[in-house]
């Protein structure tokens, strides 16, 4: 089973990236092969242009990883109540999967993570990601993770999950991702 993570910010080791990596680590502990496309990787992607079929090596690598994934994790900051441009550009690139026998995220579980400075931005951004995943024929996991970065501190000084509720949600999401994969997926 392969689980691919997409997300983060331009800052390596951002909280959204670290939460995605925590979910991937929990999936790996359940036997999955995992791969993360973090913010610095996503920053190398040119702006998506559907009229240009040629892809850079970084673009082709992301598209192929998602094409062969059994499940996905997408993590975004909730900038002003929306998905970051960095993450949205990566999602838009997956339009290249439209002609596949299994287009887009067809039938695959997708875990969604949002970190935002407030509950409203986090909830709205999580809802937007759920809508995107539905439009791309995927199945958002029942547990979605919206973290209020003002009121919640997911990690301690050593970088370990420090919030019991967030840690439980990470484990629940990993279970839903790995158990939501169907044979032949």
Q: What does each model-identified segment do?
A:
Residues 1-100, 158-185:
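N-terminal beta1-alpha1-beta2 submodule of the flavodoxin-like/Rossmannoid cofactor-binding fold
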Residues 35-47, 103-104, 108, 136-157:
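Mobile beta-alpha loop/short-helix "lid" or hinge segments that flank ligand
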Residues 106-148, 165:
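Short, glycine-/small-residue-rich phosphate/pyrophosphate-handling segment
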């Amino acid at each position: 089973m392969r689980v691919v993570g997409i997300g983060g910010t331009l800052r390596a080791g951002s909280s959204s990236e670290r939460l995605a990596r925590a979910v991937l680590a929990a999936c790996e502990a359940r036997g999955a092969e995992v791969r993360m496309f973090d913010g610095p990787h996503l920053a190398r992607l040119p702006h998506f242009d559907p009229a240009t079929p040629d892809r850079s090596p970084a673009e082709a690598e992301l598209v192929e990883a998602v094409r062969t994934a059994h499940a996905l994790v997408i993590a975004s900051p909730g900038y002003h109540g929306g998905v970051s441009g960095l993450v949205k550009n990566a999602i838009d690139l997956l339009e290249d999967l439209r002609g596949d026998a299994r287009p887009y995220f067809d039938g695959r579980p997708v875990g969604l993570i949002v970190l935002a400075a407030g509950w409203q931005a986090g909830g709205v951004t999580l809802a937007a990601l759920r809508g995107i995943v539905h439009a791309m024929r995927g199945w958002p996991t029942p547990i979605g993770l919206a973290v209020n970065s003002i009121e919640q501190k997911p990690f301690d000084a050593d970088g370990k999950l420090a919030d019991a509720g967030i840690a439980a949600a990470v484990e629940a999401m990993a279970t839903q991702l790995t158990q939501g994969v169907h044979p032949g997926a």
